[in-house]
Regions:
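The feature primarily captures lumenal catalytic ectodomains
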Residues: 1-238
Length: 238
């Protein structure tokens, strides 16, 4: 561990409120927030897991979380099968990937906030998914948060693994359960958010791309295409 940013915290996680029923909650413990300097791990930019010396390191929100992405092919609650072959050796890098790195929600909520701690390291190379080349707004969001003149942006393919001689890695600032091993299990410990990081992220993006705050819309509708998860009234809104 290179540096502890925040200590372990506790908070109450509430389930969805139902009529005529008491709103249940569960007290959760958030792991401390740390910056790690790791030598010679094997990474895949589409996985939040780190592989080193035959072991997988992954911060689960609960034991029912499924995280077989990137080079993690299969796992249960104890063991995992991982692809440990790598395509390239990288000298040094700040890890800006993770489960769902191609997904705007995970990218915005879980991955981008880590740029706010980039200056806590001396690393000048950022490792990020090459998906930002396909989605201009993803790249623009990154540009709003860092000064590209000071850093080298190394784009990594999700289908490839890499060995990094010195990896700077931040554990989860904000965490959302990626998927479930057993979808029938309904649990309350499915995520947490550190709101101060989200506020800082929001302010940086607004200051970069919105000149007149008075012109901001109160509500924003996200148009989803090429997916089955489309709002029923989408055509009416468009």
């Amino acid at each position: 561990k290179l540096k502890e940013i925040e200590p372990q915290l506790k908070f109450n996680s509430f389930e969805q409120k139902s009529l005529n029923q008491e709103n249940k909650f569960k007290t959760l413990t958030i792991p401390s927030l740390n910056i790690f300097s790791i030598e010679n791990p094997i990474i895949n930019i589409n996985s939040s897991a780190i592989v080193k010396n035959g072991k997988i390191y992954y911060e689960r929100i609960n034991t029912n979380e499924r995280f077989n992405e990137g080079n993690i092919k299969y796992h249960n609650k104890t063991y995992a099968v991982a692809d440990i072959f790598f395509d390239e050796i990288i000298e040094e890098g700040f890890f800006l990937g993770g489960n769902g790195c191609w997904n705007w929600y995970h990218y915005l909520i879980e991955i981008l906030p880590k740029t706010l701690l980039l200056e806590e390291t001396n690393c000048k190379t950022i490792l990020i998914s090459d998906d930002i080349s396909n989605y201009p707004t993803m790249k623009q969001a990154l540009e709003a948060l860092i000064n590209e003149k000071h850093y080298t942006i190394k784009l990594l393919n999700r289908k490839q693994n890499f060995k990094v001689k010195k990896l700077f890695f931040i554990n989860e600032i904000n965490k959302i359960e990626f998927n479930k091993l057993d979808s029938n299990i309904k649990n309350l410990d499915t995520g947490y958010h550190r709101e101060n990081y989200l506020y800082n992220l929001r302010n940086k993006l607004i200051n970069k791309y919105i000149e007149d705050n008075k012109s901001q819309e109160k509500k924003i509708f996200l148009w989803r295409e090429n997916t089955h998860k489309i709002a029923k009234n989408q055509n009416d809104i468009l």
